[in-house]
């Protein structure tokens, strides 16, 4: 494929596991009790514990009329993105927002209102779509470039990385990858297959030859599922892998095996 770096080529799974590579040139994150970078670094080096608490970033610079529309999960995602969205060429940098569940609590409330024949709030309805946080960020920060929102089951982070690698291969100088999730409503408790705690993080991704933490990610089909992490949901465990400095992280979910590797 002329003009496409070898590390961005998605190989046929019948021939060999597919693989991508990229550099993480910066990161930021927010969760209750972990508002600062040094808090996250200390958390990653210690025993795995889940973020707990009811706090949310204040977003004091956002006009009150807009700030009232942004729920807790959205505030966390916007705050994490803000600290990474620092490039002078920001309009040329796509954003990939990924959340396994999104604002499912808002959707449940809308369904409850429908079930009781109550009128739906137009604002609540508009904010229930999966790309609502991405759209709010583009409005609040006047970002007019490319953004998209994904959900892909347990391996949502990995699939978002594949999307980001494709954008880099297509010529984007960097890509911002924003991952966020929160607790599930009680009505879904019987279906939860991993822990669920509030968090948001953002990685700034670039080509693998750029300075930063160079990671590779390969995947292959037909892998038996592994037991989920009893403490951290998968998206949070991947961020801990980046911060802790581990050489490898292997995950098997939904008949797919994903292998994270650190280089250099």
PLM-predicted stretches and their roles:
Residues 2-124, 128-149, 179-264:
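Conserved "HGTGT" condensation-loop signature of ketosynthase/thiolase-family condensing enzymes
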Residues 78-81, 151-175:
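Active-site-proximal alpha-helical scaffold in enzymes
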């Amino acid at each position: 494929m002329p003009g496409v770096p070898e590390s961005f080529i998605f190989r046929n799974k019948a021939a060999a596991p597919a693989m991508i590579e990229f550099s993480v040139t910066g990161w930021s994150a927010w969760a209750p009790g972990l508002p600062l970078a040094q808090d996250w670094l200390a958390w990653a080096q210690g025993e795995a514990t889940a973020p707990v608490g009811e706090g949310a970033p204040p977003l004091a610079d956002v006009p009150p009329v807009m700030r009232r529309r942004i729920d807790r999960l959205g505030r966390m995602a916007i705050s994490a993105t803000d600290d990474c969205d620092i490039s002078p060429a920001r309009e040329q940098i796509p954003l990939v927002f990924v959340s396994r569940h999104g604002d499912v609590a808002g959707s449940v409330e809308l369904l409850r209102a429908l079930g009781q024949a109550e009128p739906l709030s137009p604002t609540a309805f508009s904010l229930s779509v999966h790309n609502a946080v991405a759209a709010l960020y583009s409005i609040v920060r006047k970002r007019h470039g490319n953004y998209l929102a994904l959900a892909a089951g347990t391996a949502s982070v990995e699939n978002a990385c594949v999307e980001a690698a494709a954008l880099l291969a297509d010529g984007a100088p960097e890509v911002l990858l924003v991952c966020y999730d929160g607790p599930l409503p009680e009505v879904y408790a019987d279906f939860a297959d991993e822990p669920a705690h509030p968090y948001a993080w953002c990685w700034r991704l670039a080509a693998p030859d750029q300075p930063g933490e160079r990671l590779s990610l390969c995947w292959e089909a037909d892998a038996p599922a592994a037991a989920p992490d009893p403490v951290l949901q998968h998206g949070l465990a991947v961020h801990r892998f980046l911060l802790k400095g581990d050489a490898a992280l292997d995950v098997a979910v939904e008949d797919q095996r994903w292998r994270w590797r650190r280089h250099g």
